[in-house]
UniProtKB/Swiss-Prot annotation:
GO cellular component, as recorded: extracellular region
Post-translational modification summary for this protein: Contains 2 disulfide bonds that can be either 'C1-C3, C2-C4' or 'C1-C4, C2-C3', since these disulfide connectivities have been observed for conotoxins with cysteine framework V (for examples, see AC P0DQQ7 and AC P81755).
Signal sequence bounds: 1-22
Function text: Probable neurotoxin with unknown target. Possibly targets ion channels.
Protein name in UniProt: Conotoxin Cal5a L3
Domain writeup: The cysteine framework is V (CC-CC).
Length: 76
């Protein structure tokens, strides 16, 4: 019996949380959208993986280069 009461309470709580999050999403302001965009950009920047690339010229060793809008290469 306790199991069913707990299950019903959990289902009611999740339905309340879903409706609250849906109402917040519908009334989002520009500042909330800016925060979301900034978080997405930070997450995408953290996902950047270094890629080995050959430097031009004879006798040069490969340097790790970042895949980034502004490509920055650095020596090892």
């Amino acid at each position: 019996m306790r199991f069913y009461i707990g299950l019903m309470a959990a289902l009611m709580l999740t339905s309340v949380l879903r409706t609250d999050s849906a109402s917040v999403g519908q009334t989002g302001t520009k500042s909330e959208l800016a925060v979301i965009e900034r978080v997405i950009r930070q997450r995408d920047a953290a996902d950047v993986k270094p890629v080995a690339r050959q430097n031009e010229g004879p006798g040069r060793d490969p340097a790790p280069c970042c895949q980034h809008p502004i490509e920055t290469c650095c020596r090892r």
